[in-house]
UniProtKB/Swiss-Prot annotation:
Pfam families: Ribosomal_L31. Transmembrane segments: none annotated. InterPro entries: Ribosomal_bL28/bL31-like_sf, Ribosomal_bL31, Ribosomal_bL31_A, Ribosomal_bL31_sf. One of its GO terms (cellular component) is ribosome. Its cofactor is Zn(2+). Belongs to the bacterial ribosomal protein bL31 family. Type A subfamily. PANTHER family: 50S RIBOSOMAL PROTEIN L31, CHLOROPLASTIC, LARGE RIBOSOMAL SUBUNIT PROTEIN BL31C. Zn(2+) binds at C17, C19, C37, C40. Part of the 50S ribosomal subunit. Binds 1 zinc ion per subunit. This is Large ribosomal subunit protein bL31. Keywords: Metal-binding, Ribonucleoprotein, Ribosomal protein, RNA-binding, rRNA-binding, Zinc. Binds the 23S rRNA.
Length: 69
């Protein structure tokens, strides 16, 4: 490998989640911020989060004249 062209690798990079969880990993960035992690993701927690997409579908139907009234 060529010298001086590779990014610095940090073996103790800190990952911070929006839920407050932090853990250490290896990365080319010293600190990483994420919105969701294994402590708060529904797949790992077993809890379901419902996202309100009804309004988006209704807007799409109305925009393209596909109202089913």
């Amino acid at each position: 490998m060529k010298e001086g062209i590779h990014p610095t690798y940090y073996h103790d990079a800190v990952v911070r989640c929006a839920c407050g969880e932090t853990f250490i990993t290896g990365s080319t960035k010293k600190e990483i911020h994420v919105e969701i992690c294994s402590k708060c993701h529904p797949f790992f927690t077993g809890k379901q989060k419902f996202v309100d997409t009804t309004g988006r579908v209704e807007r799409f139907m109305k925009k393209y004249g596909l109202d089913q009234k």
